[in-house]
């Protein structure tokens, strides 16, 4: 795919990430020199601000009741607390797992499953003990990233479950992995932020992009663990199709 990479020995790896725990052994590492780390939430807020600047109107905290085809070529979206539906020429369904309850009454069935992931974010205690960029532990499938003056550890994905049920074992694995590779890097005892989030996937892992089969309704769903990486490209595809 044209992605530059190089296999490194432990000695070579420690020259790039010199804060790696010397007591944690590993066979080798794969270095992706062009990879970068970013704050997904911050980027989303910046995109929102830019969209508003060029005239996009957002309706936050609006609870959608149902979606129906209109008498014309678009769709009508019913909103709780409003007597009349809102008409649109086109609508894009991108509501994650909640999309199924809107699509099934329209005859559109997509075999999406919920996958939940965990993360811990904490301030850096000693910059020299923190990662320079990002490290992925392939054994536990956990990523350790540096975001300015914070460290974020993310992974421990699970199929199914609910957002309300936060497994302590999943967080223990995150803390263990951080301590394995970067002990003493962050203030875990003072305000560490624990998070659990949901995403959707199809059995084959590829997202659903394009027409739904319902006039005026388009789909942008099930990006799995690559949601941020695929977001701008998916938006470009949707804009071109619509």
Placement of each model-derived feature along the sequence:
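Dinucleotide-binding Rossmann-like beta1-alpha1 core, especially the glycine-rich loop
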Residues: 1-10
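Generic structural signal for residues in well-ordered beta-strands
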Residues: 5, 58, 64, 190-191
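Helical element adjacent to the flavin cofactor pocket in flavoenzyme catalytic cores
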Residues: 23-90
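Mid-domain beta-loop-alpha active-site segment that forms a flexible
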Residues: 31-48, 97-98, 170-177, 223, ...
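Short, conserved active-site loop motifs that form the nucleotide-linked donor/cofactor pocket
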Residues: 55-57, 151, 217
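Active-site substrate-recognition segment that forms the wall
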Residues: 66-69, 74, 85-215
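Claisen-condensing/thiolase-fold acyl-transfer catalytic domains that form or cleave C-C bonds
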Residues: 143, 224-232
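Internal hydrophobic alpha-helix adjacent to the cofactor/substrate pocket in enzyme cavities
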Residues: 231-242
């Amino acid at each position: 795919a044209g992605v530059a990479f190089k296999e490194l020995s432990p000695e070579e790896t420690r020259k790039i990430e010199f804060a790696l725990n010397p007591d944690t052994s590993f066979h080798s590492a794969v270095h992706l020199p062009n990879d970068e780390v970013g704050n997904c939430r911050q980027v989303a807020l910046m995109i929102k601000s830019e969209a508003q600047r060029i005239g996009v109107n957002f309706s936050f905290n609006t609870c959608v009741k149902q979606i129906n085809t209109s008498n014309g070529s678009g769709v009508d979206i019913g909103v709780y607390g409003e007597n009349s539906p809102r008409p649109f020429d086109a609508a894009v369904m991108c509501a994650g797992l909640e999309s199924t309850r809107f699509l099934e009454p329209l005859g559109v069935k997509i075999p999406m499953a919920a996958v939940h992931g965990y993360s811990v974010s904490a301030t850096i205690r000693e910059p020299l003990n923190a990662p320079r960029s990002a490290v992925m532990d392939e054994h536990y499938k956990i990523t350790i990233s540096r975001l300015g003056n914070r460290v974020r550890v993310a992974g421990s994905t699970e199929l199914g479950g609910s957002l309300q049920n936060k497994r302590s074992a999943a967080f223990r694995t995150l803390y263990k992995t951080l301590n394995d590779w970067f002990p003493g890097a962050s203030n875990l005892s003072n305000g560490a932020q624990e998070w659990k989030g949901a995403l959707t996937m199809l059995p084959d892992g590829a997202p659903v992009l394009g027409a739904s089969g319902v006039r005026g309704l388009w789909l942008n769903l099930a990006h799995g663990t690559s949601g941020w990486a695929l977001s701008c490209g998916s938006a470009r595809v949707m804009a071109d199709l619509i």
